[in-house]
Amino acid sequence: MITNQTERLNFASTKNIPAYPDFLDVQVKSFQDFFQLETKSDERGNEGLYNTFMENFPITDTRNNFVLEFIDYFVDPPRYTIQECIERGLTYSVPLKARLKLYCTDPEHEDFETIVQDVYLGTIPYMTPSGTFVINGAERVVVSQLHRSPGVFFGQSFHANGTKLYSARVIPFKGSWIEFATDINSVMYAYIDRKKKLPVTTLFRAIGFQSDKDILEIFDLAEEIKVSKSGLKKYIGRKLAARVLNTWHEDFVDEDTGEVVSIERNEIILDRDTILDKDNVEEIVESNVKSILLHKEDNNVVDYSIIHNTLQKDPTNSEKEAVEHIYRQLRNAEPPDEETARGIIDKLFFSDQRYNLGEVGRYRINKKLGLDTPMEKQVLTKEDIITIVKYLIELINAKADIDDIDHLSNRRVRTVGEQLSQQFGVGLARMARTIRERMNVRDNEVFTPIDLINAKTLSSVINSFFGTNQLSQFMDQTNPLAEITHKRRLSALGPGGLSRERAGFEVRDVHYTHYGRLCPIETPEGPNIGLISSLGVYAKVNGMGFIETPYRKVTNGVVDLTSVPKYLSAEEEEGMLIAQANIQMDENGKITADNVIARQEGDFPVIDPTAVHYTDVAPNQIASISASLIPFLEHDDANRALMGSNMMRQAVPLIRPEAPIVGTGLERQVASDSRVLINAEGAGVVEYVDADMITIKYDRTDAERAVSFESDEKTYKLIKFRKTNQGTSINLKPIVRKGDKVIKGQVLCEGYATQNGELALGRNLKVAFMPWKGYNFEDAIVISEKVVRDDIFTSIHVDDYSLEVRDTKLGNEELTNDIPNVSEEATKDLDENGMIRIGAEVKPGDILIGKITPKGESDPTPEEKLLRAIFGDKAGDVKDASLKASPSLHGVVLDKKLFARAVKDKRKRTQDKDALSDLEMEFEVKFVELKDKLVDKLFTIVNGKTSQGVMNDLGEEVLPKGKKYTQKMLYAVEDFAHLTRGQWVADDETNKMVNDLIHNYKIKLNDLQGALRREKFTITVGDELPAGILKLAKVYIAKKRKLKVGDKMAGRHGNKGIVARIVRHEDMPFLEDGTPVDIVLNPLGVPSRMNIGQIYETVLGWAGQNLGRKYATPIFDGASLDQINAITDEAGVPRFGHTHLYDGGTGERFHQAATVGVIYMLKLGHMVDDKMHARSIGPYSLITQQPLGGKAQFGGQRFGEMEVWALEAYGASSTLREILTVKSDDVIGRAKTYEAIVKGETMPEPGLPESFNVLMHELKGLGLDIRLEE
């Protein structure tokens, strides 16, 4: 029953649960696939960035004389580390370079040489290993978007009169939308870009089916009759299917050109649907028409009556008329000529330049319509249009079904990589435009690729995406769970998605295809409910952007437990019968139950085991990470589970975190996949440990050493008190000792809401569910003083305060501790740069960073100048611009940093010159050493072998085929980094070793070059700071927050409350053995909320604490009541936790037994210290002259309409008058009142409130003449 899994007793009954996929794959893998930096350039797939380049290149000028081709792209290492970017407020980015080839095809320019150049295209934000981007010093996440998949969708709507209207909409990846829809008169129209409508038959004519005959033949609706008098007589009484047209040509002379032009003319002899009679037959015979079309007499014609109706509405008779009609509809102008008119339809739907269905769109259309058009054909075809219309007609005749747009086969995920591809596409298209313009201008001069390219174009598009796009969000970094959840979030909002206002109930609702893909529980409360969701624990996004979830195959009632589970998309799952993961089966996987409850689409049939197609892989497959962390979730109401999973993300990391006694077994995976902790990279031994770093010596094979440039030892620096986005702190401490052996993946440290490698968001507390003197009424919480005293819920929060030193018109600002008109006491903790010392205690109003700024004033008189020169009075021309602590700030200075640009004077320039030459010499030695090391290692591998022809990336042979390797020959190679083609030796294994060695050499060389560039930059420029800023001073202040009355706490089951009273330890209710409880919760919070999971957790937690064990109870597969009872009996704990308590104040026993146990509580980010606020003298609004509102503005409390009524009701007229005048917006009155209070005089009469003047001005603005008269 219970298996021991990493020191937690696991209650899971399901066997063979597969390992979870990496929780950050959705971000990290998507970005890797986009950049493809790990892949060799000739092996890169046609996706991501490579594909975007291929779509935009080659670029030619208008005369096709010059061609700019794309060969490859690569990036240089970033200039700063991630942490340095955060401190300096910079973007963590890499310079993107492309290798471009420019050549000339014009024979006149034969002197123009082909040029291959590496061109800088701009810096591109780069993803950190934990799936975030650092933009302007803040960590951001690009959230994946859930949007309508490209393809064709069939839907229906109802007209006001009750008629059903049907439509088919083709949504491309890029290009115009086209929609086919019926109206109440049973006519089918095509709408292009939701604008102009035209009969479908007009579109048919425009794409090549020009006559009525061609159109009717598509649907097999007419029979053709040869015209002869005798032949037609037997068809009298039948209906005409197409017009009978008399066609002739007229010639006339074009006055402008003098050419003879022929024009086709049509005359309608008989219209459609005419019933033939004798007269008609004669007319037809006389008109010299060769054949006519009659309606067929079989049944399916009725289905297609819509086509006849549409032909009746069609104003055109030929292809030429049709394209001209379409041109007029779309452009609202006459077409200049037939060619232009024809081009418009081709451009809209049949040209790669303007229209693209994408691979997904083509796949969906083929799948829906049963076509087998090749995937490369990503524009619409005639066949597509015809098949769509045929399907729509089947739909009208109830022979087909409409699509469910909320089905996950019709919605796909746009991951980071795809969103970036789109932005790069926009940037490169703009760049291509400027390149073309520049090529056209430079006709005969010699120019290079660098001259054509403006690097700002691409950077500006990418930077605006990261800075302003709705899906690039400031990362929620309260704790590791919040980070990981934010990265796995899917949003239906954003550009190209829905908007909150327009989204109805259906889109927000849970759909049966969400099972295992999107979590039905975790979504925000409020206006975004259902629009923002979370990926299921096992879910993956496939290559086309559809979400897949794994299942085990079942054949004849036997579950395949050995193979890798099969991932199915929502579409592949349609119609399958899927059983639950915890059905009864023997060890071979044979299902032993007689009947099985299965899932089939939205239904739950009870079936025979042999009919089952698949089973789930795990019971928690349905939920997201947050929901899977709630033990006994199966006993909680879904609404409360939603609150529980959302509140776990707000839990503040505590000083001493503690993993829960009752967990679900997912805690370890969340901690390791959040990438916050340091994991061992292989097996090895701990060489050195202290609070700041861990050094490990790894065991490596000779083969690994042969291709590596790294030493066996690796040192990891631990993060100490780093500020997160939300102001909580990350502080890691080691959990290994010197001499310990470690294995791959082992966690080496803890901290930041983790303990011993497991997620630890809160603390286990002894709880009693009972009322306590009314203090826990309405979800309030009573807590013991011991909890506060022992720092159980104490957290450390870090704030950073920064001050910029700018260059002003009146002179430079300056950081200093010599501040005018400030006492020595106030500056005692400041250093010579005006920065407060580390370790100083800070109170509101203290100076954190001292700064003086030049002050503009009238020119001093000569006498003043003289006196100033003698007495050196500096105070006159500068003013205090220091940064002071805000009103509620109490803390300790944790760290300070000063960044400055390099100052340029003559002496400094000379020093820089020397420093640079020393630096280059130093690095030259390092480069030579690295190459020597490479040649030695390389020679060891290829010694005695002959070359198979090694080439560089331009295809030039560097090491000729058949030559025997010598050390001298290898030394002669100048550039190893570009030897990418050909074979080194005959056998593959050695080739792989050589390629790995050169790959590692490239990485090392890149790092060295990056380090050199960076050192040079530091010497020449100093610290990189935003424009106009000379220095940047930063001070980090740590605040220690103990638990207080007013703080919000919560359990994991949505049971939240506010601390109402902190009671002395001895006054808390105590158990029979004298142990006081830590926290008292109100039992009335449980029944109506229906989150009984907290009671199960409480009881099992107490038993676990007594036995010194921890448990894992996975959701939907957790401990049963019988199992819990067995454990409580073993632990000597009363069943259900029912026990009598004693009053701490009197020592008397309470009348009734209460539920007692151990519950896991979290302290949430809503702390009273951040919310408490009182205004003294503060700012006023400029127009209304009333005090501002809100803590951030140091504002007051609004005295609103209802409060005025209250004072009126009490007749408190003077109080009311003061509130509405001198305490608010009577400007003169408030100044006089202050004076009167200071001098101890009687209060003056109030004046006119400013809001009255505002009203007057508004009325005057309406043109009313308003005067105040005494």
UniProtKB/Swiss-Prot annotation:
Keyword Nucleotidyltransferase: yes
Molecular function in Gene Ontology: DNA binding; DNA-directed RNA polymerase activity; ribonucleoside binding
Keywords: DNA-directed RNA polymerase, Nucleotidyltransferase, Transcription, Transferase
EC primary class: transferase
Entries under CDD domains matching the protein: RNA_pol_B_RPB2
Enzymatic reactions: RNA(n) + a ribonucleoside 5'-triphosphate = RNA(n+1) + diphosphate
GO CC annotation: DNA-directed RNA polymerase complex
Gene3D superfamilies: 2.40.50.100, 2.40.50.150, 3.90.1100.10, DNA-directed RNA polymerase, subunit 2, domain 6, RNA polymerase alpha subunit dimerisation domain, RNA polymerase Rpb2, domain 2
Claim: Transcription is one of the keywords in the record: yes
Alphabetized Pfam families for the sequence: RNA_pol_Rpb2_1, RNA_pol_Rpb2_2, RNA_pol_Rpb2_3, RNA_pol_Rpb2_45, RNA_pol_Rpb2_6, RNA_pol_Rpb2_7
A single BP term in Gene Ontology: DNA-templated transcription
Subunit structure and binding partners: The RNAP catalytic core consists of 2 alpha, 1 beta, 1 beta' and 1 omega subunit. When a sigma factor is associated with the core the holoenzyme is formed, which can initiate transcription.
Function: DNA-dependent RNA polymerase catalyzes the transcription of DNA into RNA using the four ribonucleoside triphosphates as substrates.
Name recorded for this polypeptide: DNA-directed RNA polymerase subunit beta
